[in-house]
């Protein structure tokens, strides 16, 4: 195996969760500017497309990263072990420091085809995928859920995953059936850690689910002794979620992050090949808590270009009465 960066991380370490159509190179750099986590994962890359001579062009932008983002981990999904083997070899050549396997995506057209969280119901295939991915020589980690249908599936499923000798397990503390409709099952953290200690003490354990910020993550790490904390949706409510010394933030800081997001979208649009409309999901992160925010968001949602969005921001900021503090 190549150098295992996981062993060099601080304890606890913090990860920005992989999120489809969210955690691309643009948004990762925005998060870095606000407050950087210890590890970045890419958004989802399909191994079947990656291994196809034509399909590769549709997913290559998902794997775009810059050297200042290291340690950079490629997050991949699929269900054919031989494709994971081939993908892992190529990812190592591309300079990634690790590979993370998606065994938790709950979306119906993924899970019901036996991929993502569907692999919870196919443990033998999941094991084959993990072992095949080691061919690239990079440390292999897994992101999964407690189970597919029921919470009590976690014991057999996680025992099986721990037995595969992986570098890190990121456990989303809900089942596939629960999606994100219920509170994460923090009450199971201690039992999961005990299972890890028994089966695979060298595998790191990262928790995910309803963790809004670094402060909460540190409290959970101190209480349960886990190794890592992964923050996902919390970053939409607080782009400064990974801040080591929390402080108050202002509306101008958020608008400055939006300007950065627009500039980075311009910079990487040739690599990512994304339409402008993909930006619209991000506007609500940056435009809130100030007079006129709702109207500005509405106007931004109707823009068709970076230039239009910038012009709206210029006009809005020129008329701002004051730079107000924002509750995150």
Swiss-Prot record:
Enzyme class name: oxidoreductase
Cofactor: FMN
One of the record's GO molecular function terms: flavin adenine dinucleotide binding
SUPFAM superfamilies, sorted: FMN-linked oxidoreductases
Origin superkingdom: Bacteria
Record's keyword annotation contains Flavoprotein: yes
EC number(s) stated in the UniProt entry for this protein: 1.3.1.-
CDD domains: DUS_like_FMN
Catalytic activity: a 5,6-dihydrouridine in tRNA + NAD(+) = a uridine in tRNA + NADH + H(+); a 5,6-dihydrouridine in tRNA + NADP(+) = a uridine in tRNA + NADPH + H(+)
Residue stretches in coiled coil: none
InterPro entries from the UniProt entry: Aldolase_TIM, DUS-like_FMN-bd, DUS_fam, tRNA-dHydroUridine_Synthase_C, tRNA_hU_synthase_CS
UniProt keyword annotations, A-Z: Flavoprotein, FMN, NADP, Oxidoreductase, RNA-binding, tRNA processing, tRNA-binding
Disulfide bonds: none
Positions of the catalytic residues: 105 (proton donor)
Annotated positions binding FMN: 18-20, 143, 208-210, 232-233
PANTHER family per the UniProt record, alphabetical: DUS-LIKE FMN-BINDING DOMAIN-CONTAINING PROTEIN (PTHR11082:SF25), TRNA-DIHYDROURIDINE SYNTHASE (PTHR11082)
Physiological role: Catalyzes the synthesis of 5,6-dihydrouridine (D), a modified base found in the D-loop of most tRNAs, via the reduction of the C5-C6 double bond in target uridines.
Family: Belongs to the Dus family.
Protein's UniProt name: Probable tRNA-dihydrouridine synthase
Taxonomic path: Bacteria, Bacillati, Bacillota, Bacilli, Bacillales
């Amino acid at each position: 195996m190549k150098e295992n960066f996981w062993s060099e991380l601080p304890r606890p370490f913090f990860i920005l969760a992989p999120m489809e159509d969210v955690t691309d190179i643009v948004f990762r750099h925005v998060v870095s500017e606000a407050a950087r986590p210890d590890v970045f994962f890419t958004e989802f890359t399909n191994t079947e497309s990656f291994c196809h001579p034509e399909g590769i062009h549709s997913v290559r932008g998902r794997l775009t990263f810059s050297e200042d983002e290291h340690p950079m981990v490629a997050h991949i999904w699929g269900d054919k072990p031989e494709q994971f083997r081939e993908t892992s070899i190529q990812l190592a050549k591309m300079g990634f420091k690790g590979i993370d396997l998606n065994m938790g995506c709950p979306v119906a057209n993924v899970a019901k085809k036996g991929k993502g969280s569907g692999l919870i119901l196919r443990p033998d295939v999941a094991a084959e995928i993990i072992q095949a991915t080691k061919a690239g020589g990079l440390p292999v980690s897994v992101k999964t859920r407690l189970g597919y249908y029921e919470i009590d599936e976690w014991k057999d499923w996680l025992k099986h995953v721990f037995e595969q000798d992986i570098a890190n397990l990121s456990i989303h503390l809900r089942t596939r059936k629960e999606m994100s409709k219920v509170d994460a099952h923090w009450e199971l953290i201690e039992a999961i850690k005990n299972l890890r200690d028994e089966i695979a003490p060298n595998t790191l354990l990262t928790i995910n689910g309803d963790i809004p910020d670094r402060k909460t993550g540190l409290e959970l790490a101190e209480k349960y002794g886990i190794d890592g904390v992964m923050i996902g949706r919390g970053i939409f409510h607080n782009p400064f979620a990974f801040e080591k010394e929390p402080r108050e933030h202002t509306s101008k800081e958020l608008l400055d992050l939006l300007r950065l997001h627009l500039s980075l979208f311009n910079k990487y649009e040739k690599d990512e090949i994304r339409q402008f409309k993909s930006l619209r999901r991000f506007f609500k992160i940056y435009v809130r808590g100030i007079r006129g925010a709702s109207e500005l968001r509405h106007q931004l949602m109707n823009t068709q270009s970076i230039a239009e969005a910038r012009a709206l921001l210029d006009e809005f900021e020129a008329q701002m009465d004051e730079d107000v503090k924002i509750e995150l």
